[in-house]
Amino acid sequence: MRAWSQLPSDRLLADVSLWSADLANLEPAVRRLSPWADSFHLDAADGHFVPSLLFFPDLIRAIRPHTAVPFHVHLMAEYPSQLATEFLDAGADLLTVHVENGEREAGAAIEQAHRRGCGAGVAVKLDTPVRAVLPYLDAVEVITLLGTEVGVKGCNLAPQAYDRLREARNLLQEHAKRGVRLVADGAIRTHTVPELRAAGADAIVPGSLVFQSADLESTFRWLRSHSVPTVT
């Protein structure tokens, strides 16, 4: 399995959301997408930090043997440091926690990931200032910006999502952190992908866009065709 830092940097990455798969047939879905996905995005939620209850460690452990594609676990929980070890042991290659957890709580989970040789990231809710990522720039490989309300599917992209990506990209440039990847999560559609890429996204989290595709080769060829973003 490859770390996120080893994924290509010259094209848009697809961090495929398994929340949009047929959950009754998760293993076949993983096998079908494995030749194309750069990573699998697994949303894990405790029902408190967000309303949803989502993927749990035993489920991740069960599907881990069926693919070599990296697992990106997006942990939406009030106390991620209490859950991080279970998800890392289950097969997470990259663990993302929220800046809204606070520096102490998020930092503890990030440290657990690094101790196990895994990558770490932070996610930012739509109503949280982008600059909240600043304390974590030396500790993470990935920053995920939510473009919709967290833990909810099927929403339209918030108009400010593009400007937030540009702001994050500029912050990374100002602080010489060009190696940190920016992930756009939420409302990934054919009409939003080009603008998200142009605004600075290194990766997107597609769901129905790929799981409902009748021609995965064409869909992923189109996704990968988007050039390196130029932020203004």
Question: Model-found features: residue ranges?
Answer:
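Catalytic cores of alpha/beta
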Residues: P28-L33, S81-D89, D127-A139, I188-I204
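Hydrophobic faces of well-ordered beta-strands that scaffold small-molecule active sites
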Residues: L12-L18, F40-L42, I63, F71-L75, ...
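N-terminal amphipathic alpha-helix/helix-capping segment at the start of soluble metabolic enzymes
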Residues: M1-S20, E27, T232
